[in-house]
């Protein structure tokens, strides 16, 4: 947001990116970056597109799910005008979240060239079921969204009742492998303090224990 990242900060970020040709993707994450106004987001997208080695802009947001009206003409305008490859990672945890308004929002995003991926969190009593997760993957794909990550639960104060053990999470993924084609099985990962990227959780298959982004 403008209060957190002023013009001088922006110039410093852009200078750093210009001097780092090994960086080809920029991620807008949060908080929720789509809580920022579209004028500022458009300025950032335009500036990033001016850096020759930046190819992709990836945005992580839950707003298109909880407030599908956020996918407005202004947002679609700057996304559609950007020459960058655009990826939006949405956060859908249960098939019930995919209502008609959300599906329409996803369709509008795809129409302007946005690739849609999903990441979910395994939550006890919400989606810790192979049936629910399989239906979620199928419904996401029907909505033009590829399953991407399935997050193992990270301990959060006041949310221990949602905790699902790594063993149970791995068993869920193995069950999904028997029900779904491989491209619909999300990768089981967790975020570890101090790590710069997500770390896969071993499921007993041939999933390598390496860091991924």
Model-based region annotation:
Residues 1-8, 59:
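Canonical Radical SAM [4Fe-4S] cluster-binding loop centered on the CxxxCxxC motif
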Residues 11-25, 34-180:
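Conserved AdoMet/S-adenosylmethionine-binding subsite of the radical SAM
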Residues 27-29:
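Short glycine-rich or small-residue beta-strand-to-loop segments that form or flank ligand, phosphate
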Residues 171-213:
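C-terminal accessory regions of radical SAM enzymes
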């Amino acid at each position: 947001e403008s209060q957190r990242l002023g013009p001088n900060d922006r110039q410093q970020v852009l200078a750093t990116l210009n001097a780092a040709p090994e960086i080809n993707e920029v991620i807008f994450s949060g908080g929720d970056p789509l809580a920022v106004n579209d004028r500022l987001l458009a300025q950032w997208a335009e500036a990033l597109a001016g850096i020759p080695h930046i190819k992709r802009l990836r945005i992580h947001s839950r707003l298109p799910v909880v407030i599908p009206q956020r996918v407005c003409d202004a947002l679609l305008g700057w996304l559609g005008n950007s020459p960058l490859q655009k990826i939006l990672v949405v956060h859908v945890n249960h098939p019930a979240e995919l209502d008609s308004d959300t599906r329409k929002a996803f369709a509008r995003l795809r129409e302007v060239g946005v690739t849609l991926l999903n990441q979910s969190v395994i939550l006890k009593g919400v989606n810790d079921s192979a049936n629910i997760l399989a239906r979620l993957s199928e419904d996401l794909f029907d909505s033009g969204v590829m399953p991407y990550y399935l997050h193992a639960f990270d301990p959060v104060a006041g949310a221990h009742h949602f905790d699902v053990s790594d063993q149970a999470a791995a068993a869920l993924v193995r069950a999904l492998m028997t029900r779904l084609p491989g491209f619909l099985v999300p990768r089981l990962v967790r975020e570890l303090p101090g790590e710069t990227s997500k770390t896969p959780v071993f499921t007993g298959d041939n999933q390598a224990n390496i860091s991924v982004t």
